[in-house]
């Protein structure tokens, strides 16, 4: 019999690149994954977070202690192709996952993680891990789950130390759509679920660097036929589709690596008068195309409670964020205006091209999960299109 004071044998490990070993209880997929560790401060929306393609190459530490209480369902998914498993490769929880209790629950988080191939662990001090990230930055690590508790610790340490990290890594090519498609699903409505678009009134081409479903839903809900194209689609092919607007999506990895093929395309598109709107990685792509620079952040911004100031209105919005790279505002050339800034650290959160229908934001106005303070940006984009077509403007805020 095991003595009451004996330490429980761990069935999961988080091994950091500096050799630190954190022991926990495993759940989700068995095996291991090497990635960068970040933390997310959102209280809700764990399915949307873990399926957001922007988290590719990352292990998400949830600062809220109770994750999984409402189970999982087939609707709260953000990646376009769940079979491709675009999104986080690992997850770290404080409390053990309990049986779900929610009218929408269709399954247990543990089983859902297994199906998604996400390696997870629970039962650790997530506050201490978050403090470590805040102090030292986002570490490279290996997360491993073995139900029998048998690990090759030397191998795990070697893999964690050897991984080069996200700098220079183009992950958009790993999570983008394989072929063009048309999106017609509209936002979720209480007691009705998601809708189906009827007759679209305008055409938006969305370049998919790892786009989230809710972005596409909001565009469709405003009357846009949304054609989603792979990240490496050329400008001639895009322009041949005769879009009324161009959307540059969110996505994972180093923007400068993705920019090798994405920036020339965006620069060609900017030679036209077609309105352009970018979010997250798309924001960074636009900044690079305009001559700016990006840089890796110390701890990144991941959560649903970030204050951002809109310089154009003077208002403060609470927004969702998910990025580990940021645009260097000092690198922006003349004619590019900084429109939004983070009130946490002063980093750039938005730009606009003076006198042109071109703008982007670093944060996620579609939320999912998170507040809807910035939903008006989708209406602003559609209004730029409608203005160009001589059509009546939508109310920007409803």
From Swiss-Prot:
L-glutamine binds at residues 54, 251, 253, 281, 284, 322, 324-325. One of its GO terms (biological process) is L-arginine biosynthetic process. GO terms for molecular function: ATP binding; carbamoyl-phosphate synthase (glutamine-hydrolyzing) activity; glutaminase activity. The active site is at 280 (nucleophile), 364, 366. It holds the Pfam family CPSase_sm_chain. Residues 203-391 form the Glutamine amidotransferase type-1 domain. It catalyses: hydrogencarbonate + L-glutamine + 2 ATP + H2O = carbamoyl phosphate + L-glutamate + 2 ADP + phosphate + 2 H(+). Keywords: Amino-acid biosynthesis, Arginine biosynthesis, ATP-binding, Glutamine amidotransferase, Ligase, Nucleotide-binding, Pyrimidine biosynthesis. SUPFAM superfamilies: Carbamoyl phosphate synthetase, small subunit N-terminal domain, Class I glutamine amidotransferase-like. CDD domains: GATase1_CPSase. Residues 1-199 are annotated as: CPSase. The keyword Nucleotide-binding applies. Pathway: Amino-acid biosynthesis; L-arginine biosynthesis; carbamoyl phosphate from bicarbonate: step 1/1; Pyrimidine metabolism; UMP biosynthesis via de novo pathway; (S)-dihydroorotate from bicarbonate: step 1/3. Its EC number is 6.3.5.5. Belongs to the CarA family. Small subunit of the glutamine-dependent carbamoyl phosphate synthetase (CPSase). CPSase catalyzes the formation of carbamoyl phosphate from the ammonia moiety of glutamine, carbonate, and phosphate donated by ATP, constituting the first step of 2 biosynthetic pathways, one leading to arginine and/or urea and the other to pyrimidine nucleotides. The small subunit (glutamine amidotransferase) binds and cleaves glutamine to supply the large subunit with the substrate ammonia. Composed of two chains; the small (or glutamine) chain promotes the hydrolysis of glutamine to ammonia, which is used by the large (or ammonia) chain to synthesize carbamoyl phosphate. Tetramer of heterodimers (alpha,beta)4. This is Carbamoyl phosphate synthase small chain. The gene is carA.
């Amino acid at each position: 019999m095991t003595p009451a004071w004996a330490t429980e044998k761990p069935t999961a490990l988080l091994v950091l690149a500096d050799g630190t070993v954190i022991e926990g209880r495993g759940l989700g997929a068995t095996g291991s994954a090497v990635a960068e560790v970040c933390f997310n401060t959102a209280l809700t929306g764990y399915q949307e977070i873990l399926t957001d393609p922007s988290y590719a190459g990352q292990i998400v530490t949830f600062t809220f202690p109770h994750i999984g209480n409402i189970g999982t369902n087939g609707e709260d998914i953000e990646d376009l192709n769940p079979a491709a498993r675009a999104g986080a490769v690992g997850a770290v929880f404080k409390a053990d996952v309990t049986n779900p209790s929610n009218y929408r629950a269709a399954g247990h988080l543990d089983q859902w993680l297994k199906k998604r191939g996400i390696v997870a662990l629970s039962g650790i001090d997530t506050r201490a891990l978050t403090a470590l990230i805040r102090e030292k930055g986002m570490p490279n690590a290996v997360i491993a789950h073995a139900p029998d508790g048998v690990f090759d610790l030397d191998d795990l340490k070697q893999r964690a130390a050897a991984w080069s990290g996200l700098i220079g890594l183009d992950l958009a090519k790993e999570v983008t759509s394989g072929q063009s498609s048309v999106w017609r699903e509209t936002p979720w409505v209480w007691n009705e679920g998601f809708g189906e678009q009827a007759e679209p009134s305008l055409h938006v081409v969305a370049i998919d660097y790892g786009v989230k479903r809710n972005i596409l839903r909001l565009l469709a809900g405003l009357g846009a036929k949304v054609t989603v194209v792979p990240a490496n689609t050329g400008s001639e092919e895009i322009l041949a589709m005769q879009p009324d607007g161009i959307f540059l999506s969110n996505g994972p990895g180093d923007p400068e690596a993705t920019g090798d093929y994405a920036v020339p395309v965006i620069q060609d598109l900017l030679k036209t008068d077609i309105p352009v709107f970018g979010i997250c990685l798309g924001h960074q792509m636009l900044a690079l195309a305009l001559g700016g620079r990006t840089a890796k952040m110390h701890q990144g911004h991941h959560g649903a409670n970030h204050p951002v100031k809109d310089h154009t209105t003077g208002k403060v919005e609470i927004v969702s964020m998910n990025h580990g790279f940021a645009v260097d505002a000092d690198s922006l050339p003349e004619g590019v205006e900084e429109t939004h800034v983070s009130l946490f650290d002063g980093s750039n959160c938005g730009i606009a091209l003076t006198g042109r229908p071109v703008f982007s934001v670093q944060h996620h106005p579609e939320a999912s999960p998170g507040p809807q303070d910035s939903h008006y940006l989708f209406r602003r984009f559609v209004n730029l299109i409608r203005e160009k077509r001589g059509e009546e403007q939508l109310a920007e805020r409803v």
